[in-house]
Swiss-Prot record:
CDD domains: IMPDH. This is GMP reductase. InterPro entries: Aldolase_TIM, GMP_reductase, GMPR, IMP_DH/GMP_Rdtase_CS, IMP_DH_GMPRt. The keyword GTP-binding does not apply. PANTHER family: GMP REDUCTASE (PTHR43170:SF5).
Length: 347
């Protein structure tokens, strides 16, 4: 046993210090980025935000809507091959370039993903997702996927430390998914005592990944557009959003009505709700590590996407970054004990 004395920080612990700027308008900010990935060699350009691979967020409908904003969607792994085929038959090539195919790490997952990727060559992204990216089996699966799909861009996680980030990149991942426990419907930290404050995880993993020519996606912990800006400021190449994109018309959650008001169910993918739906219940040897919440219906996701992108542009103007790529170079974090004036928050 040992204790690390270094203070680790989450998004709520900091603000971004404003700096002199020559920008005259938020419209001067370029949010699109272009990446060439280490292993696949593929080049992609767009806004580096990803809708999470949750079945109440990462839907085909979400992919269609967010492609119009140049945003990626990690489509959840529970669609059948037939459902994928039907989607591909109706989706444009532009939509498909904004889609990630999500998978687990079983032999059945591998075979199913191979079938999906064979449906259309425009599917260039694979998202290999497990709750705990520290297992040897997971690393071996990433290497297997890289060998099988050498030209596909592979995103793999989740981890929160530099050495494991390096391990995954060396095993074939182009992008490492960073985050254990920060999600709005994740209870891993409560159930297990395991986790890592998200901003510190992003900063440390970005440093490790960039040293090897890899990239990271900050997954979880964003509750408002300012958190997205902080994640990019901390060095994230991509930011994945779940709760911020849940509860919309395109989100895919079940709708319930109470006292004349409609709500949409949103749950973590290790929650009892998710396991009841997809694997027949919670196995006797494990505990659920997610919760289910009811969100007021929020309308089309386009309104939320515009709000997030507007906040991100504004953050860039406050530090003089004319491009999103420059934000991390111009970011100075200050530690704080408050984020906002909350006097009217309950009204």
């Amino acid at each position: 046993m040992r204790i690390e004395e270094d203070l680790k920080l989450g998004f709520k612990d900091v603000l971004i210090r404003p700096k002199r700027s020559t920008l005259k308008s938020r419209s001067d900010v370029e949010l699109e980025r272009q990446f060439t990935f280490k292993h696949s060699g593929q080049t992609w350009s767009g806004v580096p935000i990803i809708a999470a691979n949750m079945d109440t967020v990462g839907t085909f409908e979400m992919a269609q809507a967010l492609a119009g904003f140049d945003i990626l969607t990690a489509v959840h792994k529970h669609y059948t091959v037939e459902e994928w085929a039907a989607f591909i038959n109706t989706a444009s090539a532009d939509v498909l370039k904004h889609v990630m195919v999500s998978t687990g790490t079983s032999d059945a997952d591998f075979a199913k993903t191979a079938q999906i990727l064979a449906l259309n060559p425009a599917l260039n992204f694979v998202c290999i997702d497990v709750a705990n990216g520290y297992s040897e089996h997971f690393v071996q699966f990433v290497a297997k996927a890289r060998e099988a799909w050498p030209t596909k861009t592979i995103c793999a996680g989740n981890v929160v430390t530099g050495e494991m980030c390096e391990e995954l990149i060396l095993s074939g991942a182009d992008i490492v998914k960073v985050g254990i426990g920060p999600g709005s419907v994740c209870t891993t930290r409560v159930k297990t005592g395991v986790g890592y404050p998200q901003l510190s995880a992003v900063i440390e993993c970005a440093d490790a990944a960039h040293g090897l020519g890899g990239m990271i996606v900050s997954d979880g912990g964003c509750t408002m557009p300012g958190d997205v800006a902080k994640a990019f400021g901390g060095g994230a190449d991509f930011v994945m959003l779940g709760g911020m994109l849940a509860g919309h018309e395109e989100s895919g959650g079940s709708v319930v009505e109470e006292n004349g008001e409609k709500f949409m169910l949103f749950y973590g993918m290790s929650s009892e709700s998710a396991m009841n739906r997809h694997v027949g219940g919670v196995a006797k040897y494990r505990a659920a590590e997610g919760k289910t919440v009811k969100l007021p219906l929020r309308g089309p996701v386009g309104n939320t996407a515009r709000d997030i992108l507007g906040g991100l542009r504004s953050a860039c103007t406050y530090v003089g970054a004319s491009r999103l790529k420059e934000l991390t170079k111009r970011t100075t974090f200050i530690r704080v004990q408050e984020q906002e004036n909350r006097i009217f928050n309950n009204l």
